Amino acid sequence: MYNGRMQISRDFTIAVHTLLCIEYFKNDYKVTSDFIAGSVGVNPVIIRRMLLRLKNANLVEVKAGTGGASLLIPPEKISLYDIYKAAGCDEKQLFNFHENPNSKCPVGGHIHNALDFRLELLTQTLEDKLKTMKLSDVMKDLEK
């Protein structure tokens, strides 16, 4: 199990989990926010908010009431980066800086100059890698 300390919010994994449920159960169940919440282990309100984000990103269709959700795009065409963006993760900084480095200190005064571009490079590397991974790849690993 991954125990990293980076700042990607749980929204990304909730979004992936949501899309996997929609695809995996599409032929057997009406995949509603309550149904998905039972798999994810969160309140259905959190799933409804995520479904709205995924809908706004044109990844899912959600039928009003208890109509359920369905993918608008095949899983092999949905990249993890698409999901990352839809979940709003690209709007947040991957790495959060401590708030008050001492500007009078030779380290604290230059820490941003020394580290910011490296953090941007790491963020770009992650995003580039996410673009190569598809929801269908994750789907296949569920069956292992």
Regions found by a protein language model. Name each.
Residues P74-K144:
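Non-DNA-binding regulatory cores of transcription-related proteins
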Residues M1-M6:
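Short, intrinsically disordered or compositionally biased N-terminal tails of bacterial proteins
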Residues T18-N27:
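Short amphipathic alpha-helical interface segments
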Residues A57-T66, S70-L72:
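Beta-hairpin "wing" of winged helix-turn-helix
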Residues L51-K55:
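Basic amphipathic alpha-helical segments that dock to polyanions
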Residues N43-I46:
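Short coil turns linking two alpha-helices in DNA-binding domains
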Residues V31-G41:
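A short alpha-helical element within helix-turn-helix/winged-helix DNA-binding domains
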